[in-house]
UniProtKB/Swiss-Prot annotation:
CDD domains: RPS2. The gene is rpsB. Belongs to the universal ribosomal protein uS2 family. HAMAP family: Ribosomal_uS2_B. Residues 247-295 are annotated as: Disordered. It comes from Rickettsia africae (strain ESF-5). Keywords: Ribonucleoprotein, Ribosomal protein. This is Small ribosomal subunit protein uS2. InterPro entries: Ribosomal_uS2 (IPR001865), Ribosomal_uS2_bac/mit/plastid (IPR005706), Ribosomal_uS2_CS (IPR018130), Ribosomal_uS2_flav_dom_sf (IPR023591). PROSITE patterns: RIBOSOMAL_S2_1, RIBOSOMAL_S2_2. Pfam families: Ribosomal_S2.
Length: 295
């Protein structure tokens, strides 16, 4: 049986996941996910991050295991390349530049744009066909193609709505989240101390700005998806040697049953004692190191 990836307190601390925003910028709806504050910066309760990450990774695993499609979304600069890298690694879909309004709710229009992109691609790759165009016309076609690729490269093989949306910054991607909610698409999202966790089925409290944090999240998400893919292929009797080829092409389109919503661990009693101790000790060690540096 495939093993769903997991994460511990130390890995999250090393990636800076515990650093929230300045206390003046917080969203009160995140109160239950905040451990405290240090130097006017909110500290995220990593005990809950560990527990809720596990729930989110299981949701990703189960979605792909059942041949579902996952759409990764983050258009912020520091996450753009990382999102694309890990979505491609696990054969899923992504939007990493501008979210076009209606990408989910007005799919017919988006599908038309994808068709236009594919036609431009086909024309520009056909040397014989290009002989009928002027250099200026070819240049204009290339520019149109590049513009479409920025928004559509990660979804050009997506033929229907995704079964799960994975978001890094809920504030920046609020339009994508609203569209997913309208279509009843479950949402996994990293929620920082200035985020609104409403409408997020699988919240993961954590820093959504740090490149190290974002890379850690995406690595875990991709690993969970790959484990789900492996289970799906085994169940279908697919040759595991074809794993890489299958991943490169993306997953087939099948309906997936609605995933159960994640339980929100808003109280520390829901977290095991070992994780409690590990987190508190790690914070104490960090304070001691800071004090010794200032001595």
């Amino acid at each position: 049986m495939s093993k769903i990836p997991s994460v511990n307190i130390k890995a999250l601390l090393d990636a800076g996941v515990h650093f929230g925003h300045k206390t003046s910028r917080w969203n009160p709806k995140m109160a239950s996910y905040i451990y405290g504050e240090r130097d006017d910066v909110h500290i995220i309760d990593l005990r809950q991050s560990v527990a809720l990450m596990s729930v989110a990774l299981n949701a990703i695993y189960e979605t792909v295991k059942k041949d579902g499609k996952i759409l990764f979304v983050s258009t912020k600069i520091q996450a753009s390349d990382i999102i694309a890298e890990y979505a491609e690694k696990c054969g899923q879909y992504y939007v990493n530049h501008r979210w076009l309004g209606g990408m989910l709710t007005n799919w017919k229009t988006i599908a038309g744009s994808i068709e236009k992109l594919n036609k431009l691609d086909k024309t520009l790759e056909n040397e014989e066909a290009l002989m009928g165009y002027t250099k200026k016309e070819i240049l204009n076609m290339s520019r149109k193609k590049d513009k479409l690729l920025l928004s559509l490269a990660g979804i050009r093989n997506l033929n229907s709505k995704p079964d799960l949306l994975v978001v890094i910054d809920t504030n920046k991607e609020h339009i994508a989240i609203n569209e997913a909610v309208k279509l009843n698409v479950p949402i996994v999202a990293v929620v920082d101390t200035n985020s609104n966790p409403d409408n997020v089925d699988y919240p993961i409290p954590g820093n959504d700005d740090s490149i190290r944090s974002i890379r850690l999240y995406c690595s875990l998400f991709a690993d969970a998806a790959l484990q789900g893919l492996e289970e799906s292929m085994k169940a279908s009797g697919v040759d595991m040697g074809a794993m890489q080829e299958h991943t490169d092409k993306g997953l087939t389109s099948k309906n997936v049953s609605k995933l159960k919503q994640a339980k929100k661990f808003s109280k520390t009693k829901n977290i095991d004692e070992e994780t409690n101790t590990e987190f508190e000790q790690a914070l104490n060690d960090a304070d001691e190191n800071k004090n010794s540096d200032n001595a």
